[in-house]
Amino acid sequence: MRALVVSMAVLLASIASIATQAEPRQFTFSWPFEEGDALRPRGGTTRGAALTLATEPSAAWRAVQEAGLSKFERDRRAILAMAGGYRTSFDFLETVGFTPGFQPSRPYQSWGTEYIYVVEDTGAFIRLQHLMVMFVADREGKVQGPFVQKHWRQDWRYEDTDLHVFIGRNRWVRQERTADEARGRWSQAVFQVDDSPRYEALGEWEHYGSYSAWTSERTARPLPRRETTVRDDYQILEGVNRHTLTPTGWVQEEENLKLVLDAQGQPAADMPYLARELGVARYEHLVDFDFSAGDRYWQRSGGFWRDVRAAWDKVYAERDTFEYLEEAGGQEMFVPLFEYADRLDNGEAYDAAAAAEVIRSTFARHLR
């Protein structure tokens, strides 16, 4: 079956229409005295096709453990060890409230199967692209798919001194760091499905035998889709990320604060923070999963997405500050970009001039 390459909204709607409700999800770490199901987790409710998880340590993980490596090379291998095919799970839970009469929002849980490609590796710079490839069981247990979705991207740069950070109200600014601040550290820049920026921060890898983890500085980011669809009472998700390798995958942990800005774009004086949230995303290596639809999508559309990244690079090089509107004229930025990439995946030849016009017109609507 030809892969269905769709937008995030269409993907979720398509999957929901054929979904079988999963077994009740666990509240292992939650609010035990809340009555009823007001805190029943929201998010994905589908079941995927049968999967086989890896049980033996990966070659990439073993490569990180090799004796005699320089710190730089061990860092690099740890980043590269995040590539590959995974079952992913996402859990987010408010754990502490700072407002009178605080009521925690519903926890969020979801899942996916995705492949992480090494798009670029020049030594001190590594680019990883996530691509979701999902097979979903319908109510009768029949497997539907594959559904293909370009997901997020992470760029890693060694001793980076030129960052772009979010300051709220759709605004981004250049942040220059000193060589001393960057020494021995890696920046991680995270990008959304349309390659627009999400957050960027410096952090340092630590390696102790079988333990390898990178921890970021506190960084601000726009509200994620899982929040913008249900609330608008705060403006910045401010948090610390930790990426930890495991023998059969990796885990991303987040500790986030939900920050309110005043009309001047400053933290609200009386009550800047609403709540603290913990997040855990687990990436578990898969064995013998068919990611070929994702391979084909990336082979056919990768040149277009390279040009999209180049357009963003031009923005970063030329502007110390810019405003990015995720939605403009009733349309989100990813829509025309996904539509053109879908045409390429369906066999249309890449037309550099046509692609350039799609990119130009899209950026003109969404950047200020």
Predicted regions and their residues:
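Short helix-loop boundary/capping segments
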Residues: 178-238
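Hydrophobic/aromatic beta-strand elements that line small-molecule binding cavities or substrate pockets
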Residues: 104-106, 110-120, 238-245, 270-271, ...
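Extended amphipathic alpha-helical segments with heptad-repeat/coiled-coil character used for oligomerization
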Residues: 120-152, 156, 160-165
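Amphipathic/hydrophobic helical signal segments and adjacent flexible N-terminal regions
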Residues: 22-81, 94-99, 104-106, 125-127, ...
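Extended serine/threonine-enriched, polar tracts that run as long, contiguous segments within proteins
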Residues: 215-263, 273
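A short, structured loop/turn motif at beta-sheet edges
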Residues: 80-84, 118-124, 242-250, 285-290
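Bacterial N-terminal signal peptides
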Residues: 7-15
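Positively charged n-region of N-terminal signal peptides that target proteins for export
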Residues: 1-3
